[in-house]
């Protein structure tokens, strides 16, 4: 039998993933992943699961292979992926990696035996729809046909901007401009900034970009996006890292870093 175990260490932001055999307690657990869980660029993803006869969620194992499904954040964008992992050698083979640069693709489930992915595809103005992606034929089959119900904000300007904090830390945010705004006129408008501070133990993880300009602009309850219809600029999902490297704790300099972020 095969099972996975996880541990987390808050002080270092380290996490480890182990394989072990519940039916053989004499066999030592094996570390298969050892990483900083705040490092999104090197996130290997989550192990694919399936339902057993009893409707319970279990690992999807095929010929001594496990499968990882990841978000695929990189410094040049977001490209979700599926990897096959050999349990003996821990070598990985990439089965699929999204290539969209003008859309956002989310991998929702993977049917291992049939090489079929349930995926969702969207853009900033195209409402998310669901597809089956067949890896054997490299084909997409659309299974929903939802239309954009938020036409009043469909043509707003949206981009992910990058800038530096006073201490050199790279920051990012999603900038929305009202429909019809002429950037060449440099007209000043009121702005709403939507941010929440997050703790990090290293500068590298704090600087990673996890916004996607192709994510559908969805005005959920409580969202600041509604203010675009009233002529406001919206700066959303703003990076607000509070960093404490080494023996320093993030909140030791909370106020100073909070001001620097703003």
Give the role of each language-model region:
Residues 1-139, 145-156, 170, 207-208:
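Beta-propeller folds
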Residues 108-262:
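Serine-hydrolase catalytic core recognition
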């Amino acid at each position: 039998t095969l099972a996975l175990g996880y541990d987390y260490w808050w002080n270092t932001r380290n996490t480890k993933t182990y394989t072990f055999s519940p039916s053989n307690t004499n066999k030592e657990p094996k570390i298969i992943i050892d990483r900083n869980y705040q490092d999104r660029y090197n996130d290997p993803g989550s192990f694919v699961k399936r339902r057993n006869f009893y409707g319970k969620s279990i690992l999807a194992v095929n010929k001594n292979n496990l499968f990882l499904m990841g978000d695929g954040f990189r410094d040049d964008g977001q490209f979700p992926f599926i990897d096959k992992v050999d349990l003996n050698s821990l070598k990985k083979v990439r089965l699929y990696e999204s290539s969209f640069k003008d859309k956002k693709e989310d991998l929702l489930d993977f049917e291992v035996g049939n090489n079929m992915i349930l995926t969702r595809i969207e853009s900033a103005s195209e409402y998310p729809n669901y597809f089956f992606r067949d890896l054997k034929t490299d084909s997409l089959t659309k299974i929903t046909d939802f239309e954009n119900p938020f036409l009043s904000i469909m043509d707003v300007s949206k981009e992910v901007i990058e800038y530096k904090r006073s201490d050199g830390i790279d920051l990012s945010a999603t900038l929305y401009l009202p429909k019809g705004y002429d950037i060449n006129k440099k007209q000043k408008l009121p702005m709403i900034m939507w941010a929440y501070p997050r703790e990090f133990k290293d500068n590298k993880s704090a600087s990673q970009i996890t916004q996607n300009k192709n994510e559908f602009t969805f005005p959920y309850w409580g969202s600041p996006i509604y203010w675009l219809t009233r002529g406001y600029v919206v700066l959303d999902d703003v990076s607000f890292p509070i960093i404490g490297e080494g023996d320093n704790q993030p909140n030791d300099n909370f106020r100073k870093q909070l001001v620097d972020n703003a």
